[in-house]
Amino acid sequence: MSFDFDATVVGAGAVGLACGRALARRGLSVLVLESEPHIGQGVSSRNSEVIHGGLYYPTGSLKARFCVEGRRALYAFLDSHKVDHRKCGKLVVATDEAEVGRIEAIFRQATTNGVEGLEHLTGPQARALEPGLNAHAAMLSPESGVFDSHGYMLALEGEIGATGGSVVVSTPFERAEPLSGGGFRIVAGGEGGATLTSRLLVTAPGLSAQAVAARIEGYPVERIPKGHFGKGVYFRLTGKAPFERLIYPPPIAGALGTHYRKDLGGQAVFGPDLMFVESEDYSVDPAKAEVFAGYIRRFWPGLPVGALTPDYAGIRPKLHGLGEDQPDFQLHGREVHGLNGLVALFGIESPGLTSSLAIGEAVSEMLTHD
């Protein structure tokens, strides 16, 4: 049977585009469908734009593996495509004796995960690197950084196009049904949308992962994990902060904690926090500035009064609720849902952006060896 496309990807964020690129590099004809008017308008555009080292994630997890592999691949990609980035390094800071044990546990986990160049630092050593920092002790991850995530996604889109693939925006996925001889019939484009056939199907739509999976005929409903919206807001600093590196506290339950970064334009940004919400809401409550200031002054006592201004908010596609353990990425192949030629992605939150190239390769491997 002939198909319109070898592979169709739902979602043109960083992960969907990375999946499309990986499949196109294997010689497949690729179509990427995006419901928004532009690529990367969802989770991929409302985050910290941090390149994570791979410090925190449990041994053997997909997050641990993909973050380290993806980070190495990402730096190489950014270099080769001349996408702006800065490998500034990260300090994870213990602000008192009680947090030192948590820093040591992160160091052990990161070492097990294969993260390179880690260093234990005393308080004076940390302050020598970053004057103004309140640090009882710290660990340095020199492989962490920041980058232009939109420039990265444009480069991915360009690679897909260069191989003859297509990224089509303003074209929402409506439904799909398996064909008797293999492959899928897909309807996309809203009311009166187009119908196409594809041998392979990848769903990577971020916050709508559960809704998209439910519109694939034959996908077992009980196999679709429950999704949660984890909202995080960011505040920017009026004026300059004295730090060049990323500054992180020890992680909190379900998130990495409210951290500092200097973006590529030199702007100091703090965030995100974590609040579970029922629907997409990207407002930022200015009253949260004082709460943020309390977090920040733990590692930067010199934060000026009234210096924080609301910046933006993002929502993470979480697979856990308040007080629940944070699960791994989920890549559902045939062994989960029973449908040949389909990989559905769920819960691709942090470190999904850093991991995107590795996720793309893994998905491509799953489909071409299915």
Locations of regions flagged by a protein language model:
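Dinucleotide-binding Rossmann-like beta1-alpha1 core, especially the glycine-rich loop
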Residues: E49-Q125, A135, G257-T258
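Glycine-rich phosphate/pyrophosphate-binding beta-alpha loops
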Residues: Y56, S144-V146, I252-A255, V343-S356
